[in-house]
Amino acid sequence: MEDFIKSSKKVLLGNKKKGYTLPTNNKLYPAQWNWDSGFIALGYSHFKLKYALDEIKTLIRGQWKDGMIPHILFHDLKTDYYPNHSVWACGNKIHSSGITQPPILAIITKLILDKNRINNKYKADFKKIVKGILKYHKWFIKFRDPNNSGLVSILHPWESGYDNSPLWDEPMSKVKIPKNLKYKRGDNKVVNPEYRPLDIDYDRYVTIK
């Protein structure tokens, strides 16, 4: 167990950038991902509370004015990832995608609070985080459940967190791909293509983004 903890710390710290952490330390995911940051923050909370709070605060810094927290924040604009910041062409203070991901930040923050004794040094940070999370949840209620059905909608497989699931095969098969659609993928060059979505799937993802 001790070796496992040690190697886990090494991975987190090895992927760390200024204020945020990459999901993988290669070109596969060269940005800050919404719910990845939540789990990363939870990991940091076991040995470095400041890093955990920095991770979440940086994510909330990319929050849109209407309350949405995007699923990607592009802090480094020089990447081969597609679709990149120029394709999405949105974001407020930080370049971002135009969709979101499952709102796990509230659960993550609660777990961190339960685990750590919070002194005055971090109270202001937690207040800022909770304020951002509340605004985020209100956004989901207003824009993703406008009829008050109690069911929040998602608009893209990437918002689900399980975009490679066969559950998407039938609905996504109805997406009409433009004949002039052109782009260059990099994800299937970094890792084994067998572990990545098929080109036809990616074409559909990009079409409806």
Segments from the language model and where they lie:
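Extended ligand-binding clefts on enzyme/binding-domain cores
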Residues: 137-209
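Tryptophan-centered motif/residue detector
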Residues: 33-35, 107, 136-141
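Low-complexity, Ser/Thr/Pro/Gly-enriched N-terminal "stalk/linker" regions
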Residues: 1-32, 53-54, 58, 72, ...
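Acidic, low-complexity intrinsically disordered regions
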Residues: 29-31, 84, 135, 154, ...
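Solvent-exposed loop and edge beta-strand segments that line ligand/cofactor-binding
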Residues: 20-38, 42-46, 83-102
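Extended, hydrophobic/aromatic-rich amphipathic alpha-helical segments that build helical scaffolds
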Residues: 38, 130-137
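Helix-terminus loop motifs that line ligand-binding clefts
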Residues: 49-131, 141-144, 148-159
